[in-house]
Amino acid sequence: MHAFLVILFMIVIGALIGGITNIIAIKMLFHPQRAYHIGKWRIPFTPGLVPKRREEIAYKIGNVIEEHLITESLIKEKISSLSAREAIESFITQQIQKLKKDNATLQNFAGYFGIDLAKTAEDKLSNLIDEKLAQYYQDHNQEPLKSLIPSELEVELDEKIEALTPLLCDRARIYLSSAKGEQDIYNMLDTFFAEKGKIIGLLQMFMTKENIAERIQMELIRLTNHPKAREIVAQLINNEYMTLKNKSLGGVVSPEQFNNIKEKFTPLILSYADISARVNQPIKDLAPSIVKYAEQHAATWTTNLIVEKAAEHLSSIMKQVNLSGIVEEQINSFDLDYIERLIIEIANKELKLIMLLGFLLGGIIGCLQGIIALFV
């Protein structure tokens, strides 16, 4: 009986020593949180392991996460996976459908950035037109018009000029043959007689004004059909046309005239462009073909582009993000009590097993000591 009590006592003492030692060891991982000194001598094991090595632990954890857990190759693999592609493509498709349903406009997108798209676009377009016109005038104002006219347009103008003589003569004949033409000739003849007085009155002794007007009308009509008259008209028109083509742009349009033209031309272009109406028009109505194409191809194309560009620039992105640095900084910012709670929550079961193992090993060692003590 005495031997049994001795062994039991040694088991209890050993278990208590082993268990309490492990409990203290676990506590010493986190406590004390600062160093204690006796004079200049620092008490051993202060601060605890975690407070003392927190920066080193944070650095190591950050490196482990970046080099072994969230690696560049792993992220590339996940981004390129079928599930990731399907998720991205599904999201893009949903957004396109949402744009159609919500009647989204270009101004809606610009509004997210605080931009008045209509005013901005009009200002940009107005400045661009003014700059281009001014630059064109400055570069070409000494050049002849014929060098500035496109060859196709020049050919067409030449054809129009050639057709101008018959047209003018035919119109003149029609006018002279009309009642208005006849009346205008009579009125001019009446004015002419009134100005010339008695000398012209002698003609009226042989012919009446009506006869004279009729003869003049007939001669003018005959003149419009005469080949020589038409040749003279054609030559005059062609001479003026060639003179105009050989003039410089600056000789035809002065700087003041150009500025006046520009001031009227730019607002005219802007009014035809009607930018305000276009940027506030639903995109599905503004560019239905683009929306249709986007529905059919944009999701797949954009997904491929996102995956390719993400993989291409992932290395530089990860360097700029500095994942290990973020983890290290975050861990260093945690309160020590929070780190203790976090570790205990994660390893609670294992820590309890360690404490139980301490009691068990202590008990076994105590039992062995008790047995040895009986035989010594």
Curated annotation (Swiss-Prot):
InterPro entries attached to this UniProt entry: DUF445, UCP032178
Transmembrane stretches, start-end: 4-24, 356-376
One GO term describing the cellular component: plasma membrane
Membrane as UniProt keyword: yes
Keywords tagged on the record: Cell membrane, Membrane, Transmembrane, Transmembrane helix
Record's keyword annotation contains NAD: no
Pfam families: DUF445
Topology versus the membrane: Multi-pass membrane protein
Location relative to the cell: Cell membrane
Record family assignment: Belongs to the UPF0754 family.
Name of the protein this chain belongs to: UPF0754 membrane protein Sca_1420
